[in-house]
């Protein structure tokens, strides 16, 4: 035992500490403090053990919640007369003093503070407080967990108090939570009970499918190409010389164009209109272009559409010129002048046409008609 400390009781864990050289004054509180349930503090007051209370630690602490009881040891609940139960809250004379049964029900005491009521016909409940009303008669008509209410059975009709997510007279209708179309980007809405879920298409995520997944997050583009995100897809902006979905292909370098004069065998002619003045002959107005020249023009940079257009235009022009020549020859053989300048028989009345201006003159009256000039049918010559 250290100097200046003296234990007052075997149960007490506290000591009275005195200053060195000063006597310990234990008689200040020991005369009135219940040392069996506490000890003296340095200031002379009683310090109670756990489970005891009071100025002198003379009273035990009852069980928490004990209403009509006492204790002999800490944490007890000893009921007073007329009370029962764990917390002494049950009235043993409840059937005689309180009459809890309603609507003419008879109270029967069961002991230990418990009772039950014998209800009259048409009533039920612990205290016969409920009447056999519409809810009782309908046999729990509310569905999906709804609560039937009929004002304790005294209402004419019942009503159903529905849980969240259901509506209807008997809570039979599940509210369509997809009615407002909460899912975006073409997602499928799945209705539940007071909830919904979105089945997102590929490329989208989130509760409402509003998050576009970054397809460039995995860095699919090669060769240092820049990735551009799309909906469930991506594009790679490849540098020069590379191609493919992810720029994985090395594009070949095209060879410089070369011109080779290859013999093509027999030369074919393409007829196109000439640009200069044409002489008056059957072959006038024609320009011959060989296939070799066309090939050289194509190698010089003339595209296939332009070449096709050139050939078609040349063929049409050749056909038109040929038709004109044939018609001219046919008319010349018949002695009929083609449409154009006014023509009359040339001197000596030869069957030829002249391209000069017409000069109309009257024949002398005594000059006979030439025999080799046949008269035209349907025309009359005035002399």
From Swiss-Prot:
Q: Which GO terms describe its cellular component?
A: membrane
Q: What does the UniProt entry say about where the protein is found?
A: Membrane
Entry keyword annotation includes Membrane: yes
Disulfide pairs here are: 29-40, 33-46, 48-57, 66-71, 79-88, 95-107, 101-117, 119-128, 135-148, 142-160, 162-171, 178-189, 183-198, 200-209, 216-227, 221-236, 238-247
One Pfam annotation reads EGF_DL_JAG
Cite the ranges annotated as topological domain Cytoplasmic: 328-383
Query: Record's superkingdom?
Result: Eukaryota
Residues modified by glycosylation = 157
Question: Could you tell me which residue ranges are on the Extracellular side of the membrane?
Answer: 27-306
Which topology term describes how it sits in the membrane? Answer: Single-pass type I membrane protein
Q: Which PANTHER family is this protein grouped with? A: CRUMBS FAMILY MEMBER, DELTA-LIKE PROTEIN
Name by which UniProt lists this protein: Protein delta homolog 2
